[in-house]
């Protein structure tokens, strides 16, 4: 189920169970995982498959392996806050994922996270090829960190 309110999302979470975040792109998905205490967001991996059924199966495997209790998906909206074509693509993906899992899904504004992740990796001297392979997972960890910071105040 897709939850639009962060407080409601938080109420549905099981204490001391991790969360995952997804940075959804047309060519790849970045995945991040929190620790059980939800104090740290870590890049987990990148899914480079574009077939949605395979992507959802991969996500189900990750959800089962790490026993997560909630999913955060980065929602790409433009700088003015307007919905874009990519926003609609991500919302459709979230709806498809919601049909496959019985977990709360929260859509988090992800403006500029991939760019920020790429810049962060660049500042650490990561080569361009490696940045492109890892920036989505790092972006997912930034999306997750934003939510983790927000739920600390609930």
From Swiss-Prot:
Q: Where in the cell is it found?
A: Cytoplasm
Q: Which UniProt keywords apply?
A: Cytoplasm, Hydrolase, Nuclease, Ribosome biogenesis
- What's an example GO cellular component term for this entry? cytosol
Alphabetized GO MF terms: nuclease activity
- InterPro entries, A to Z: RNaseH-like_sf, YqgF, YqgF/RNaseH-like_dom, YqgF/RNaseH-like_dom_sf
Q: Which Pfam families match?
A: RuvX (PF03652)
Q: Which Gene3D superfamilies match?
A: YqgF/RNase H-like domain
Q: What is its EC number?
A: 3.1.-.-
Disulfide pairs here are none
| One GO process term, biological-process aspect | rRNA 5'-end processing
Question: Which SUPFAM superfamilies does the protein's record reference?
Answer: Ribonuclease H-like (SSF53098)
In UniProt terms, what function does this protein have? Answer: Could be a nuclease involved in processing of the 5'-end of pre-16S rRNA.
What family is this? Belongs to the YqgF nuclease family.
This chain's protein is named Putative pre-16S rRNA nuclease
Annotated organism of origin: Rickettsia conorii (strain ATCC VR-613 / Malish 7)
The root-end lineage is:
Bacteria, Pseudomonadati, Pseudomonadota, Alphaproteobacteria, Rickettsiales
């Amino acid at each position: 189920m897709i939850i639009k309110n962060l407080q409601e999302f938080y109420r549905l979470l099981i204490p001391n169970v991790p969360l995952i975040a997804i940075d959804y792109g047309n060519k790849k998905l970045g995945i991040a995982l929190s620790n059980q205490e939800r104090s740290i967001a870590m890049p987990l991996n990148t899914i480079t498959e574009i077939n949605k059924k395979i992507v959802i199966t991969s996500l189900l495997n990750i959800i089962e392996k790490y026993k997560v209790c909630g999913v955060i998906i980065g929602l790409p909206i433009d700088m003015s806050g307007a919905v874009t074509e990519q926003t609609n693509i991500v919302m459709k993906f979230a709806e498809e994922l919601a049909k496959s899992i019985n977990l709360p899904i929260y859509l988090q504004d992800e403006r500029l996270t991939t760019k920020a992740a790429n810049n962060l990796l660049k500042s650490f001297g990561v080569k361009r090829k490696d940045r492109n392979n890892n920036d989505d997972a790092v972006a997912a960890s930034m999306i997750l960190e934003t939510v983790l910071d927000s739920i600390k105040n609930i």
